Amino acid sequence: MSDIINETKSRMQKSIESLSRELANISAGRANSNLLNGVTVDYYGAPTPVQQLASINVPEARLLVISPYDKTSVADIEKAIIAANLGVNPTSDGEVIRIAVPALTEERRKERVKDVKKIGEEAKVSVRNIRRDMNDQLKKDEKNGDITEDELRSGTEDVQKATDNSIKEIDQMIADKEKDIMSV
């Protein structure tokens, strides 16, 4: 039965980590190297993440500076950033690429908050589905005689505790991201 509880916690933690990655990709109007996480460049025929082709610095709150290790890849990186449709406009001087991150309007901030809430709700649904799967597994084990009725009750309570903790953590992550987005 402890295997089921451990699997529950592990799967719920993966959902939380996935949420964390998704939230990192939502810009709060400040320059952040995570903005380029999903951008891949066709580098000598292989799709390669920008982070592997260049160093990314944030010298100012609203400026990203990308310094490619291979200066011949500047144009390719610039095209990939434009193609990624991130809502930013890269400029290049042939050696480095600069991205000025525009300040978010109140309307855009509210849209981003809606997106954050939607992503958070999807994570909660994922956690609840894991809870249902694990409870079903416990009931099946009890029906097969692998565990007793008391162990079923105890296991169900442990799964519920793990669910409650995960939901609380998700709510906190969402609240923090909302605060980050809405702060000017």
Curated annotation (Swiss-Prot):
InterPro entries: Ribosome_recyc_fac (IPR002661), Ribosome_recyc_fac_dom (IPR023584), RRF_sf (IPR036191). NCBIfam families: frr. This is Ribosome-recycling factor. GO terms for biological process: translation; translational termination. It comes from Staphylococcus aureus (strain NCTC 8325 / PS 47). It is found in: Cytoplasm. SUPFAM superfamilies: Ribosome recycling factor, RRF (SSF55194). GO terms for molecular function: ribosomal large subunit binding. Residues 134-167 are annotated as: Disordered. Keywords: Cytoplasm, Protein biosynthesis. Belongs to the RRF family. Responsible for the release of ribosomes from messenger RNA at the termination of protein biosynthesis. May increase the efficiency of translation by recycling ribosomes from one round of translation to another. It comes from the Bacteria. Pfam families: RRF. The keyword Cytoplasm applies.
